[in-house]
Amino acid sequence: MTHNSSNKKTIHIVVAALSIAAIATALLVYRSYFITGYDGNEAKWIYIGDKMTSDSIGQILGSELGATGKKAATIWSLAGGDASRAHGAYRIEPGMSAAKIYRKISRGAQTPVKLTFNNVRTVNQLAGLVGRRLETDSAAFLSACDSILPEKGFKKQQYAAAFLPDSYEFYWTASPEKVVTTLCGYRDRFWNDERRAKASGLGLSPVQVAIIASIAEEETNDRAERGTVGRLYLNRVKKGMKLQADPTVKFAVGDFSLRRITGKHLAIQSPYNTYQNAGLPPGPIRIADRETINAILDSKPHPYLYMCAKEDFSGRHNFAVTYAEHQQNAARYHRALNSRNIK
């Protein structure tokens, strides 16, 4: 009897010990896979292409996210992760557990990617930015522009008027058509009835406002001056005068770094050369921002017909009503150019 009791006691102890060991192991596994997180100092982006296999996804997780990534890869493998659902971009935050990483990727719960452009001149440059930030490439974006924008009333030279600089969010996998349509949709909402009425009051279409705004942005570094500059161009158009805007010449030449416009530049044959052609150029010379467009729409009437960069190289301008006054301003500016040996 005593011997049997001793055996039972031993069995109970062994069972208890094994149970404790099992619980401890389970807790360690749980902690390792469900609590202990990615130990990177900053967030990490994981990009999974549509042609990637389950094996290659596991390899990426392991190589990019260290020990936590290897555990996520183990879960992925054991659970038979579906590669077709994982296509996308995922932002992995510090502290994110292996289990959470697995769930995020296996469900295709992508993290939106920010597409920000504030100083993009051309649609080609915008296409390059889209190609760097999203899965699609620049050529596909431009092709989507050609397919979509003419149907919305934009001529090829007017494509820059279809977009507004800002920060936008897209899934990395967004199609180029989705990107173009979304960006253009923001522009359409910006041009509400109130703004369209203001443009009409100036005798302009929204595209023409964007053209004037684009030249004003290139003409002056001072945002407070852009409405005045835009109204000056409008004054000249209404009087049948050529704009004679230097930024349009730089655009025609293809060199915005020019510091001094000379006779050879003015002689360039281009529909964008407003020294050669009357009226507005056929399209914007850059993607104009909302603030400048609003400045044009809200600009106060004034009599100025001429402007010249200030001789202090501040990026601001001296404005003039008469050509004689303008010549005096121009003479001061050219003396300043010569004194700095700017050719």
Where are these regions (language model features)?
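Conserved SxxK-family serine transpeptidase/carboxypeptidase catalytic domain
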Residues: 244-286
